[in-house]
């Protein structure tokens, strides 16, 4: 390859600083998407993808573009310890400080999957489960910070359960119609164990997506606490390692927590209002149907009076 002679003292051209033909047209957001960063959240590693950007103000003498490398360099601060609201806010302020002549608004989006070790329902085993999450932060006159988590769970259809119980009743009547008054307890027990479920209710893997707007001054991102509360409210979180005793306990949990998507959404609403005390929240539940070729979905949102989040 031919060598190129570069004058050692000549400054490098900065094309971004040149005034473009339409530099009087501002841009709402300019930045980078899909930046890979190794972060730490809740004391655990998080292989994250980050979107980072700022606005570009309109000006007759404005710049053609922003210096994205300055934003990239400031992101390294996020990797230096536990991811906290303060660390995120500091990064956003550094975005604005890196090019104050062009911008007065900065934003950051962090997404990934947090791995948590979860115990089995009864046996002395544990397994790992991945929880998708997203953190959205913006800084203009103040900091706005929201946390979204996805929690998988099982849902058994109440209507299908009722239809299945009716089938069991009908089958029992048919099998013992010859001598209904002479059926012993042991016969009933044997029948239930061998033929007591002529039909089974349908259930499906389901997802709860919950977004909360954090209060000012929160020291930590309450991701594990939020996941735990969602799972407790629903009662049927998906399992990891399962032995037969755990599977039976899971069947019992599903039977005791029959849910339409509307029921699941209302359970989460009551939990978030009574236990979490965030400025605002929204939620979406998806029952990925095993009966239908479509999903059953319910959505709900709330914000405290006077909050514009």
Curated annotation (Swiss-Prot):
HAMAP family: GTP_cyclohydrol_B
Reactions mediated catalytically: GTP + H2O = 7,8-dihydroneopterin 3'-triphosphate + formate + H(+)
Organism: Serratia proteamaculans (strain 568)
Family matches, as InterPro entries: GTP_cyclohydrolase_FolE2, GTP_cyclohydrolase_FolE2/MptA
Keywords, sorted A to Z: Hydrolase
Protein name from the UniProt record: GTP cyclohydrolase FolE2
Marked site positions, May be catalytically important: 157
GO biological process, one term: tetrahydrofolate biosynthetic process
Primary role: Converts GTP to 7,8-dihydroneopterin triphosphate.
Keyword Nucleus appears in the UniProt entry: no
E.C. number: 3.5.4.16
Top EC class for this record: hydrolase
Pathway: Cofactor biosynthesis; 7,8-dihydroneopterin triphosphate biosynthesis; 7,8-dihydroneopterin triphosphate from GTP: step 1/1
Family: Belongs to the GTP cyclohydrolase IV family.
């Amino acid at each position: 390859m031919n060598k190129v002679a570069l004058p050692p003292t000549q400054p490098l051209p900065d094309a971004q600083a040149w005034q473009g033909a339409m530099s009087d047209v501002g841009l709402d957001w300019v930045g980078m998407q899909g930046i890979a960063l190794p972060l730490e959240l809740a004391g655990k590693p998080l292989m994250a993808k980050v979107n980072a950007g700022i606005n570009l103000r309109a000006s007759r003498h404005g710049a053609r573009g922003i210096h994205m490398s300055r934003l990239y360099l400031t992101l390294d601060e996020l990797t230096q310890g536990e991811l906290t609201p303060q660390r995120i806010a500091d990064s956003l302020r550094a975005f604005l400080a890196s090019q104050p002549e062009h911008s007065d608004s900065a934003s950051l989006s962090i997404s990934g999957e947090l791995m948590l070790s979860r115990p089995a329902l009864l046996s002395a085993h544990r397994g790992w489960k991945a929880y998708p999450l997203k953190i959205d932060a913006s800084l203009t006159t103040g900091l706005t910070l929201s946390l979204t988590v996805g929690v998988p769970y099982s849902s058994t259809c109440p209507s299908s359960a009722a239809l299945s119980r009716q089938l069991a009743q009908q089958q029992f009547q048919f099998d013992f119609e010859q001598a209904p008054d002479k059926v012993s307890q042991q016969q009933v027990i044997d029948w239930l164990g061998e033929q007591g479920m002529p039909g089974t209710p349908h259930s499906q893997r389901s997802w709860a997506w919950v977004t909360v707007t954090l209060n000012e001054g929160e020291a930590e991102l309450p991701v594990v606490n939020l996941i735990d509360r969602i799972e407790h409210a629903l009662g049927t979180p998906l399992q990891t390692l399962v032995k037969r005793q755990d599977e039976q306990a899971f069947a019992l949990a599903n039977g005791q927590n029959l849910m339409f998507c509307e029921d699941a959404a209302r359970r989460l609403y009551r939990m978030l209002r009574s236990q979490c005390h965030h400025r605002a929240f929204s939620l979406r539940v998806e029952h990925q149907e095993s009966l239908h070729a479509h999903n059953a979905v319910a959505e709900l949102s709330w914000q405290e009076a006077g909050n514009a989040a």
